[in-house]
Amino acid sequence: MISRITNKLQALKEYDEKALITYVTAGDPDLETTFDLVLAMEKAGADIIELGIPYSDPLADGPVIQRASQRALNAGANMEAIFELVIKLREKTQIPLVFLVYYNCVFKYGLETFLNRCQEIGIDGLIIPDLPLEERRELQVMMQQYPMDLIPLVAPTSEDRMKEIVQDAEGFIYCVSSTGVTGKRNSLAGNLEGFMQQLRTYTEIPLVIGFGISNSEMMDKLKNICDGFIIGSAVIEKIEAGLEDRSSVERVSKFIEKLYEFKNLG
């Protein structure tokens, strides 16, 4: 089954456009604002939206997204409430939606129950940053019966390991631009171009760069070596900046509009 993610990325490729993928933590600062943020980001030009399921111990996340997770948990965000949020969103939009979720959350919910629920509500893909390679293979087999993509994260590592991770990948490959946790950076890994070229020899799946992408200058430097960009911590910072005067949605919308304009000019 071809997912909405694949359809969207194929359509962008036909027009020689890069994918603009944005991330928000579901429930930060509350579920109502997340609802508004998703619709505003789509209107501003986002092609795919990642919804992070808040978790108390997010190992791959830097301080910005950790704070977002804590705000969401404090506001009462939980799995069922987030599922309800997606149901409401699906009444308004068909934009591809991806859950970024830690494996422990999925395991506690029950793997098959979680997948069934995701399919019912219209989730198009899963990113599980702490999923071991061995469990990944089992999950890939299970997910063949669902119209959802299991999206791998790949960082510069051994050739054999990279080949194994991208084998049978679907949707897109989440290419980690720098070591460490998520967050804005002033510079990215030195040999990012070599890493991307190497990955391209292993797979034809779209390569999307994340971890540290925060502005159009970075996008400009990377546009020739990837098929899209994931903007996460920079979006959360706009949300944070607008908490006091409730301008988060407006700030995020303007930020995404600028990136979208640049993406199309570039």
Curated annotation (Swiss-Prot):
> Which reactions appear under catalytic activity for this entry?
(1S,2R)-1-C-(indol-3-yl)glycerol 3-phosphate + L-serine = D-glyceraldehyde 3-phosphate + L-tryptophan + H2O
EC number in record: 4.2.1.20
* GO function terms (MF aspect): tryptophan synthase activity
Keywords of this protein's UniProt record, alphabetized? Amino-acid biosynthesis, Aromatic amino acid biosynthesis, Lyase, Tryptophan biosynthesis
Question: Which cellular components does GO assign to this protein?
Answer: cytosol
Q: Where is the active site?
A: E50 (proton acceptor), D61 (proton acceptor)
Query: InterPro entries attached here?
Result: Aldolase_TIM, RibuloseP-bd_barrel, Trp_synthase_alpha_AS, Trp_synthase_suA
Q: Does the keyword Lyase apply?
A: yes
Q: Which CDD domains match?
A: Tryptophan_synthase_alpha (cd04724)
Q: In which pathway does it act?
A: Amino-acid biosynthesis; L-tryptophan biosynthesis; L-tryptophan from chorismate: step 5/5
Top-level taxon: Bacteria
Q: How does it assemble?
A: Tetramer of two alpha and two beta chains.
What does the UniProt record say this protein does? The alpha subunit is responsible for the aldol cleavage of indoleglycerol phosphate to indole and glyceraldehyde 3-phosphate.
Question: Which family does the record assign?
Answer: Belongs to the TrpA family.
UniProt-recorded name of the protein: Tryptophan synthase alpha chain
Q: Which gene encodes it?
A: trpA
